[in-house]
Amino acid sequence: MNRRRWWRSSERRWRGLVSLFLSVLSGFLTALSMPGFLSGALIWFSLIPLLYAVEGRGVWKRAFLSFVYFFTHVLISFFWVLPTLTENVPLVFGRYPSWLGIVVFVLMGIIEAVPFLGFGFLSYFAPQSIVLKTLYLASVYTIFEYLRGVGELGFTGGRISEALYSHTGLIQIVSITGTLGLVFLIVSLNVLFYEFLRRRKGLLIFPVIFFVYLLNSSVVHLLPVPERGSFKVVALQPNVPTSLKYSVSSGEMLELLESMTKDFHGSIVITPEAFFLEDVRYSQKLRELSEENTFVIGFPADNQNSVFVLEGGRFRKVYSKVKLFPFVEKLPYPRVFGVFSFLKGLSYYEPGRNFSVFNVGESPPLSVQICFESYFPEVSRAFVKNGSELLIVVTNDGWFHYKAALLNHFVQGVFRAVETRRQFLQVANTGITGLVDEYGRIVDALPLRVRLAGEFHIKARKGETFYVRYGDWFFYLSVILAVVSVFISRMRGERNEGIGIRL
């Protein structure tokens, strides 16, 4: 009897270790599908190990395994944040030791993964029929992916839809559904492929994948040929390393601005975020430069992270950042997270009050968002609803050493462009500075980590897409589909996947 009990206990431990390994494997494969890693095609299969891991498990084990999956995905996908937290920020601001950056990095992974406890928990109630199960699990995953981006700590980075940024045909659906539609599609195919394998019909995977890529290719060939726009701007990529940026004086940056624009006359010149680190509205030299060119220039002022237009010697503030970055630009929930105030950047800022659209000379109505605001689709939506005919983001990505970090940020513009059918220009300190057209095609980009001033010709567009008009309606559809799937399953007398399994 004791031997039998020992055997059963060993079997449970072994199965638990296998399930844990499969969850980690899912996170690893999902990370490898992200921009700058191995291949976006991995996303069609990356959730299959997780689905095997949770099969036959109780609700709490499912919740834990789902958490482990997304925690692994975040730590690998955002590995480039670690040297920023352990090297760059302590070096520049000197507020904490490097080892504490590791703690913060792990806590970031925990915060991002917490919503997926809910996915694992609710996966217990999945119907057994293949169609209802696919609809249910895809809907539940989509629900928690949306919730992860909501609130003071909300962030959309690492969304599995990012793996498809180069699948130009498939991503056209985001003009209707937003990226949540892609999330739903990805999870649906993973569940479908898992069921094929479980039922020993794995060969059916190949025609489905063939159809997906045939559809992608067909849509690409139907898209209009890229056109050169009539609105010309000059984007500056000053390539000032973080190790120098916070020690260089405004006078030196002014000299750099002058040298980079000396060959341009009568142009609209756009600088990255915080080109100057102090309010320079009283600089006579800068005003003199504006007699030659018009500047869209970023610097902090009035306790806000702002963008100004300098035209004919006159400054006007055109936008202040609304979505401030947690812990660096604002302290969310101070009573809870007050201990993390050491992560503060230059200052805690006041958020801007509106998503303002403006003109520069004879330009079409345009808008400028700042840094990681491009991760949030509601920002671009708000600008377009306010009349913006093209989208610009200015950023300082010099904090990050790795190309994967720069690409991850840049591809957010691919999705924002398709969602809104607006051309999207990113202007970055070290790169990537480039232009994406309204169909998500990367039209032009400057070389990374090279000091350059590049001319970009942008095409303005009017009108509102379905997504701009109705926003994240797909979230509500996912809620309805999840409820209806369970309801139909109960009406048919089906048992859910977890019935008979211990909690």
Swiss-Prot record:
It comes from the Bacteria. The chain crosses the membrane at residues 13-32, 34-54, 63-83, 102-122, 124-144, 173-193, 203-223, 468-488. It is found in: Cell inner membrane. GO terms for biological process: lipoprotein biosynthetic process. GO terms for molecular function: N-acyltransferase activity. It is a multi-pass membrane protein. Pathway: Protein modification; lipoprotein biosynthesis (N-acyl transfer). Residues 231-460 form the CN hydrolase domain. InterPro entries: Apolipo_AcylTrfase (IPR004563), C-N_Hydrolase (IPR003010), C-N_Hydrolase_sf (IPR036526), LNT_N (IPR045378). GO terms for cellular component: plasma membrane. The active site is at E273, K321, C371. Keywords: Acyltransferase, Cell inner membrane, Cell membrane, Membrane, Transferase, Transmembrane, Transmembrane helix. SUPFAM superfamilies: Carbon-nitrogen hydrolase. Pfam families: CN_hydrolase, LNT_N. The keyword Transferase applies. Its EC number is 2.3.1.269. Belongs to the CN hydrolase family. Apolipoprotein N-acyltransferase subfamily. NCBIfam families: lnt. Catalyzes the phospholipid dependent N-acylation of the N-terminal cysteine of apolipoprotein, the last step in lipoprotein maturation. HAMAP family: Lnt. This is Apolipoprotein N-acyltransferase. It comes from Thermotoga maritima (strain ATCC 43589 / DSM 3109 / JCM 10099 / NBRC 100826 / MSB8).
